[in-house]
Swiss-Prot record:
Residues 198-244, 510-529, 570-600 are annotated as: Disordered. This is NAC domain-containing protein 14. Induction: By cold, heat and drought stresses. Residues 220-241, 577-596 have a biased composition (Basic and acidic residues).
Amino acid sequence: MNQIKNKTLPEMTTEQALLSMEALPLGFRFRPTDEELINHYLRLKINGRDLEVRVIPEIDVCKWEPWDLPGLSVIKTDDQEWFFFCPRDRKYPSGHRSNRATDIGYWKATGKDRTIKSKKMIIGMKKTLVFYRGRAPRGERTNWIMHEYRATDKELDGTGPGQNPYVLCRLFHKPSDSCDPAHCEEIEKVNFTPTTTTRCSPDDTSSEMVQETATSGVHALDRSDDTERCLSDKGNNDVKPDVSVINNTSVNHAETSRAKDRNLGKTLVEENPLLRDVPTLHGPILSEKSYYPGQSSIGFATSHMDSMYSSDFGNCDYGLHFQDGASEQDASLTDVLDEVFHNHNESSNDRKDFVLPNMMHWPGNTRLLSTEYPFLKDSVAFVDGSAEVSGSQQFVPDILASRWVSEQNVDSKEAVEILSSTGSSRTLTPLHNNVFGQYASSSYAAIDPFNYNVNQPEQSSFEQSHVDRNISPSNIFEFKARSRENQRDLDSVVDQGTAPRRIRLQIEQPLTPVTNKKERDADNYEEEDEVQSAMSKVVEEEPANLSAQGTAQRRIRLQTRLRKPLITLNNTKRNSNGREGEASHRKCEMQEKEDISSSSSWQKQKKSLVQFSSVVIIVAVIVVLVEIWKESRDAKCSFLFHQLDSFKGMFT
């Protein structure tokens, strides 16, 4: 093979080369790799060995439009790719930018340049370009894509003797938008056949044609349409699209999508039993008639579904949200309350019966909203979801209790005070003198079905039967028979917000206070190096000690209990030993103080003695010096007198 490459082939015309390519059996293709394009074809072309690479013609691609270039290729094939050598045309004489503009449009580079390696050595770069009609920046994108190969070796820069600067262009035509260049790999890896267009299939994602901006994945239905367009692009193909099959595929896909959504909704309902009992005032939320494939099978927003905590931090999101942004708001509470409280003078038979749901799936909440009524505790029995409730032991929605109160001529002002804030309606129910007394206040902190009684213990049952019946006056005796001896007085209920959980810090002081200051000091003295760790435990509040703090289903109380001092014989002995040690310590301190005072007095005396002795020495020295001075003066005077006498004798 190497010998064949090294041999100089005889010069052939284009017609001869064309005939030789057509003489090859079906299935032979010109499919060089990136490494072969750089190391062999581009290297030979730059070094001036044109005859050896004549299979790739030399064309200035910027002087032709992309749809004219396939006719200039030496290799005639049905494959939508062509190879050309293109001389480097600088946009500016002193710059490195290439001029890629044509008469009708321009080639625009997109994406990052990719490296081409040979044995872990970078030998070249590959740039992806897309052809646009018109002029930038308002060009219209087309389906013509080109890969530009350039060598990075300094020996192939085109400045050496006998060299010319060239780049190798690989032209592609993308028949449809089904093959997204941003998500495709090298198109040369696709198995092409001359008589079919299966390479246009949306499942073929082996092209590396990179578009300017990546788009999202195409839906299966759209991809089927793209397949139809792709198959119908070429008129000389043997494979024809079956329109009926494509249409059936689209219909089947739509039905499959709807079935999947229904199954998803049923699965969520089975996993969340509360979702089976979510009626509104006007009927069920979900039904076959109200189902839309674009909407979620569950009415609640997915952000609240399966949440451990309720999303009620100041934002009362009571609407039923769908994926398309629409929402179905709850029934107006004003109309409901007007019907309950302001129409109690009318006959109960003329009123419109209504029932609010006894349980709702408040986002993040997995318990019954109202599972037990204190005033129905004797007459209403609660059983598992598998059991049936019959007779008088049936579950009655909480809103009917307020209606019964109105039927017994209880003042509505005394019964309920509506507070309209943040889209919710809460009630403060004193009800001191009515038939239910404090039970009504402990029953429901809100008429709104989304607000449940936080003081009720959790129930294991999530299903109760819905009842649409009215309570006759004879049933009131059952409520009157209810004893109120052990009921709590919740008239002082304080609404503290809608946070999902409350944590209380309760610190209990020691039961036996230490009154003796000395003993306390002794204990501190003995145990100053000990660290007493507080015993903390989290206990669930008993229902009898709860006060309404919001809408959370559980309350957690953090109790910190300090260690209680134990008064034992050991403590007494330790206290006595501490007192003795303190006394001895004080004696030592006194003795040290005396020693310090005595030493300080001795130091003062010593200092005074030193000062006195120094003064005496100084005085003695002064006296000696004076005496010496006197003697010297007397001697000098006598000497002078003697000299004077000698001079007198000489003159006389």
